[in-house]
């Protein structure tokens, strides 16, 4: 029987807790193995890597970087491309733009071996947009590349579906949303904003990319 291996790329704000959750609930989720890729060997990240390995995840690094990690006491089990091609599912949690680059340079190359590739909200165009409980019916077994939309897009889509679409899709005419979030995630020590900041609207039609993503999300259901 084929082993179910989940490979997470990136150990930042999204990647680190996700890897930990997958390890902790491995049996309940029916996962045989969790692997993760770390790009840079950083002293400040050692405790994070040690914890993830202790919880059962296996570390993968770029070919040629093994020595850098070992110098800091981190022992890689896998090489980057090896970890990708042996996985059942890839979850890309890298910063904006990196997921698209990974798709072009690595994921498409191994698309005949890996069942599915998931990327985060910033990777517009990576694949079909998806939000849990919103457009589940739009998913198809042929959808190999999926973009999990951002938290703000999830919020707007959930409110829209609950208030305007639950009974009849024709109820939705227009919606205006204001999203307020904390200054930083706990794992983000830089660029802290100690007071409210209002951002510019970068999308002429929808205002923000979150709203545009929400519209694209509902378009998968044939609504827009």
Enumerate the language-model features and the residues they cover:
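N-terminal Rossmann-like NAD(P) cofactor-binding subdomain of oxidoreductases
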Residues: 2-182
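C-terminal substrate-binding/catalytic lobe of Rossmann-fold NAD(P)-dependent dehydrogenases
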Residues: 169-224
């Amino acid at each position: 029987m084929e082993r179910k291996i989940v490979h997470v790329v990136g150990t930042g704000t999204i990647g680190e807790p996700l890897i930990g959750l997958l390890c902790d609930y491995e049996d309940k989720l029916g996962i045989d193995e969790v692997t993760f890729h770390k790009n840079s060997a950083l002293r400040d990240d050692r405790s994070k890597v040690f914890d993830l390995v202790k919880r059962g995840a296996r570390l993968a690094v770029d070919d040629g970087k093994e020595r850098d990690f070992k110098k800091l006491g981190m022992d890689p089990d896998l090489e980057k491309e090896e970890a990708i091609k042996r996985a059942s599912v890839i979850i890309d949690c890298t910063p904006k733009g990196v997921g698209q680059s990974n798709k072009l340079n690595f994921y498409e190359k191994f698309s005949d071996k890996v069942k599915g590739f998931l990327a985060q909200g910033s990777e517009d165009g990576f694949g079909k947009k998806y939000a849990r409980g919103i457009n589940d019916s739009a998913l198809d077994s042929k959808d190999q590349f999926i973009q999990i939309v951002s938290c703000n897009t999830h919020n707007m889509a959930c409110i829209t579906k609950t208030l305007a679409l639950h009974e009849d899709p024709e109820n939705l005419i227009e919606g205006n949303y204001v999203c307020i979030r904390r200054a930083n995630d706990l794992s983000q020590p830089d660029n802290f904003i100690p007071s409210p900041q209002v951002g510019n609207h970068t999308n002429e039609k929808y205002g923000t990319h979150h709203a545009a993503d929400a519209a694209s999300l509902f378009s998968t259901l044939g609504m827009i």
